[in-house]
């Protein structure tokens, strides 16, 4: 009998123990990360050939205490290595663990290598060579506090390497973890399996191998025991022959059907190649498809299992498509897969909650460094309508708004407009359309609102929005709105660089829905920009706090003699330049200046016929004791702007301060008169939110119109 150790991913030890016992192992004992067991030569070779869950099978050679590097050296050298492998074989050492004396695994591996080489040299006057890549023999040393364990790795390469994936790392799941997921899913051999997000097909291939009784080690071409001097080739040949016979028979007899789909054609090509190499291609149908539009590919016959490892994001707020996908997927399961089982393996329990399904079983496991969960669901035998009334009041309001506004927007010649703006207090979001894409802005809920309820309402809003507007998952973007401080409004939220052009009257603008808090176009200023265009012919135009220069574009298209665009952000100025180029507004008459607008304003001595300024409500600045407050400081601002405004010129001043009050008495002292035009600048899509901005036209005193 051999004493052996099978390692596995944490969380899979009990499954592995059961598997080894089925293979004939005795005296199985679970420890963290594996199972100790006893077995004769046949059991040992069968565990190597047939274990779907083990990472490695190790043959312990010695165990001893280590209080110094000399103890490590002597303990390893005490093994008669000439009885383990030939001096003509290559070897490598894998060392893990440290203690007070051996603090570096590389140092530990070096001491072990020296001990093995010296052992051969003293006995045979020859030394074996070390090979880092595919050595004939792999020695495993594990140091835990003062105890060292030395073992021969009978596996060679990890047992998760079955030989059917030709590129390492082409899939996020190791094969032995995938096998565990299949076993935990509740799937029964003989019933169908569907993976609607199959990637390179690992889950389906592992399940098909089980259905066809195909040993996971059958097609491996390298083992760690072939150079072991006690290797019994005859028993190994018997194990191989038995596995070959069982596979041929199993492949002929199985009636299981497997269907995999994925939106990415390239990974499907990988999946087909992997299935061919595994010998189970005839059992699996791979087809391109979007999981958010999944139909049951096997509606007739026995109910089966939908099993998948869906995508997940590091930040939920940056992955609205995943929220939408999971939410839709839950409805699809209930409506199109009655009596089926559903099992999903994910690193995001929060995303799984979007399914709105109650799990009957739950398992935890590690996928590399990630803490993951597998949840199993038993779907009702009564199909639900796919038109589930999620957030019904919100959906009805959105449907009504879309019907009214879509026709209006087409008449106006605009691609971007607001569809919904917290019309219903319990659904505190804004929904904006940008051509065929939609942005949902979640206003950060107050602390008094239960976070879980707020999150679930957001999920409902996403689901209802996609359902009402007929969106696919890649047409939706989610943003969270909260007060911006300092430079946070300029900071990147993503790096997708997905710009596209939209139309606003006769202007074109580049928008980016993902990378920044804002999209590049303030929709509520649409009419103000149009008015500036109508006022600009033959004028010298100044745009302060210009953002991406949308007002400058309208002024340029309106025939402005010159435009000057000032903003502190290089990113937004480059964006403004792209907007000008998209509208064929190029030349030296269109200046772009990167500067702190307040500092630039204080030193500027040019004059302009038409000025547009839309300052922040509050910001930090090097001037005015480091802050700017539009209510407190607007008269100071007007005083500076008056110097730059030509006689007969017009200043348009807008801000987003709720309850803003113009100081008319101080304004009169400055020598300016103001006319509020807020109602004239508010368009139909912002009719419900009269306080989204306030807007004023100012002129020199005595020039009132």
From Swiss-Prot:
Catalysed reaction equations from the record: guanosine(2445) in 23S rRNA + S-adenosyl-L-methionine = N(2)-methylguanosine(2445) in 23S rRNA + S-adenosyl-L-homocysteine + H(+); guanosine(2069) in 23S rRNA + S-adenosyl-L-methionine = N(2)-methylguanosine(2069) in 23S rRNA + S-adenosyl-L-homocysteine + H(+)
Residues covered by the THUMP domain: 43-154
Signal peptide: none
Class of this enzyme: transferase
InterPro entries: 23SrRNA_methyltr_KL (IPR017244), DNA_methylase_N6_adenine_CS (IPR002052), RlmKL-like_Mtase (IPR000241), RlmKL-like_Mtase_CS (IPR053943), RlmL_1st (IPR054170), SAM-dep_methyl-trfase (IPR019614), SAM-dependent_MTases_sf (IPR029063), THUMP_dom (IPR004114)
Principal location listed in the UniProt entry: cytoplasm
Assigned GO CC terms: cytoplasm
Subcellular compartments: Cytoplasm
EC number: 2.1.1.173, 2.1.1.264
Keyword set, alphabetical order: Cytoplasm, Methyltransferase, RNA-binding, rRNA processing, S-adenosyl-L-methionine, Transferase
A GO MF term: 23S rRNA (guanine(2445)-N(2))-methyltransferase activity
HAMAP family noted in UniProt: 23SrRNA_methyltr_KL (MF_01858)
Role: Specifically methylates the guanine in position 2445 (m2G2445) and the guanine in position 2069 (m7G2069) of 23S rRNA.
UniProt similarity note: Belongs to the methyltransferase superfamily. RlmKL family.
NCBIfam families: PRK11783.1
The protein, known as: Ribosomal RNA large subunit methyltransferase K/L
Organism whose genome encodes this protein: Photorhabdus laumondii subsp. laumondii (strain DSM 15139 / CIP 105565 / TT01) (Photorhabdus luminescens subsp. laumondii)
Lineage: Bacteria, Pseudomonadati, Pseudomonadota, Gammaproteobacteria, Enterobacterales
Gene name of the record: rlmL
